Amino acid sequence: MNEKFSKLGFYPSDILLPKKDVDMSKWAVVACDQFTSEPEYWERVEKTVGDAPSTLRLILPEANLKAPNVDEFIADINASMSKYLEEGIFETLKDSLIYIERGQSDGKIRHGLIGMVDLDQYDFTPGSGALIRATEGTVLDRIPPRARVRRNAPIELPHVMLLIDDPEKTVIEPLTAAADKMESVYDFDLMENGGHIKGYKLSAAQIDAVADALTGLTTDEAMKSKYLSLIHISEPTRP
């Protein structure tokens, strides 16, 4: 791993992608914590996927968290993970970052970067000073079933999204400008009117530049300029 990432809490990772013969429009589904009150959404996804390889077989939709057979769901997930690995449907992008462009159904494009998060640098406790903090409340009763899915899982399918405070646009925007010259790793429509997704593998030089940009955002000077408010407290006037 590029040593420049060692103190950032976000790193390049070994990223598994389906091989070219997999139908990506059936492979990709939304995160497990979406549409929790709409089981009919997940029923439609089930019909769309059918017997095709899909991440639907590798996640526990949280619409099913209270199902009486949730332990069977979890066992099936772990079995599907092992099956996909044994069948060799994945290729591995070693020590990589992927720049993505997500075209929404309303025409807006969201830009991002896929890598690995160091959970030792994360804390969801309100008021935490950790490098990576929660932006919303954590639903604690959803943690145990998520932990059970991961306990015997041979692969990991995280869906965490991090926000960066980058007013000078040093991290993502240089990749956007270079996207047409980068190696494309996927480009397809998402199911259920989910829009379109494109992914591009970063070069070694681009990974190095991302590390430098992120490091610049975490310097003491940068943190103070953005977040430190100096409060002057006067001594009380004595009579």
Regions found by a protein language model. Give the residues of each.
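Helix-hairpin-helix/helix-loop-helix acidic hairpins
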Residues: 191-228
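Residue-level detector of conserved catalytic or cofactor/ligand-binding positions
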Residues: 231-239
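Structured catalytic/nucleic-acid-binding cores of DNA maintenance enzymes
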Residues: 157, 222-224, 238
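N-terminal extension/subdomain marker
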Residues: 1-190
